[in-house]
């Protein structure tokens, strides 16, 4: 009799185990399909968001290019570009900076909403610093020259330089996004003089670049990085990366050596979905990096909760049925 009872119990338990396995398999399959669909839809969302961020950055850059084009043919600047100053004429030079800013730049931007030229470095080596009139020493001009703003190989092409400390202003705020900037330069050629007469300098605070695509960061649930064509950092939603001034070397190589613009990247920190879009205007790379757990984390957590509840319910049913079965057996 005891052996018979044990056999019946084993059958009941085996039956519930089979039911548990079957239900778990069905639930796992449904959740896997949901996870794959969610990942596919999320990739599309990220792609649209990255393309939107890249388009906004292109609009921002195109405005800078247009401003440079406008002042490249402005005859009002010609008289200043020919000037040379002695060390004793520093205040005269600063007065000229104020006159240029007030009479030329401010009048073309009444609403004060457009990006402005941060400085002009003439062919004679004179620096007109519109970002900070008091920060116009020779060391600033030397650093601009070291960047390559007057490099003959650049011709008239606009060049951008990696994120770095903003040396064209004298005061630091302590906020890396405000203290770091992306420099851009363009050599200006005069058709009347048949020579390069100056270089336009644009100094864009990282904070201003970040504001251009900030809304897209929220949509992606990850981080966005803006790199130049060589993989150097220009801007990012990652505060630590901005403070460091560069991205991880392994990540940089992975981006530059990519075979497709949308891929999964596995690192020591986990798996990430990566989306890259390259600008035809500036050759900048807009890169979104999203941890996979941010995409399917909620679905996986829901699956785990349902699975735990399912097991508890089945175990409860086993206990109840065994108790009921024992009640019907003769003592």
Where are these regions (language model features)?
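Extracellular/periplasmic ligand-binding regions of membrane signal-transduction receptors
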Residues: 62-99, 118-133
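Extracytoplasmic/periplasmic sensor domains and loops in membrane signaling proteins
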Residues: 90-102, 132-173, 236-264
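Solvent-exposed, extracytoplasmic
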Residues: 98-111, 199-241
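Extracytoplasmic/periplasmic ligand-binding sensor regions of membrane-associated signaling proteins
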Residues: 109-113, 122-203
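A short beta-strand signature within small-molecule sensing/ligand-binding domains used
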Residues: 176-190, 268-277, 284-286
């Amino acid at each position: 009799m005891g052996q018979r009872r044990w056999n019946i119990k084993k059958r009941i338990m085996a039956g519930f185990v089979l039911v548990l396995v079957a239900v778990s398999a069905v639930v796992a399959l449904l959740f896997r399909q949901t996870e794959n669909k969610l990942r596919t839809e999320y990739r599309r969302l990220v792609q649209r968001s990255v393309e939107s961020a890249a388009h906004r950055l292109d609009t921002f850059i195109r405005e800078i290019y247009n401003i440079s084009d406008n002042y490249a043919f402005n005859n009002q600047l010609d008289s200043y570009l020919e000037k040379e100053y002695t060390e004793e004429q520093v205040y005269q030079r600063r007065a000229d900076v104020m006159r240029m800013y007030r009479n030329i730049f401010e009048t073309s931007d009444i609403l004060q909403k457009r990006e402005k030229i941060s400085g002009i470095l003439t062919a004679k080596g004179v620096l007109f610093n519109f970002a900070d009139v008091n920060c116009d020493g020779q060391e600033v001009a030397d650093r601009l020259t070291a960047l390559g703003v007057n490099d003959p190989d650049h011709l008239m092409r606009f060049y951008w330089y990696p994120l770095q400390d903003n040396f064209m202003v004298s005061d630091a705020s302590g906020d890396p996004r405000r203290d770091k900037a992306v420099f851009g330069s363009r050599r200006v050629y005069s058709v009347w003089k048949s020579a390069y007469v100056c270089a336009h300098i644009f100094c864009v605070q990282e904070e201003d670049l970040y504001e251009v695509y900030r809304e897209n960061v929220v949509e992606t649930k990850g981080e966005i990085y803006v790199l130049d064509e060589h993989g150097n950092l220009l801007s990012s939603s990652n505060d630590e990366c901005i403070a460091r001034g560069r991205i991880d070397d392994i990540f940089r190589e992975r981006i530059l050596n990519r075979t497709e613009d949308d891929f999964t990247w596995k690192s020591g920190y986990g798996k990430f979905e990566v989306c890259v879009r390259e600008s035809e205007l500036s050759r900048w790379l807009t890169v979104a990096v999203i941890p996979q757990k941010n995409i399917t984390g909620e679905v996986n957590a829901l699956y785990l909760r349902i699975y735990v509840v399912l097991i508890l319910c089945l175990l409860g049913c086993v206990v109840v049925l065994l108790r009921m079965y024992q009640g019907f057996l003769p003592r």
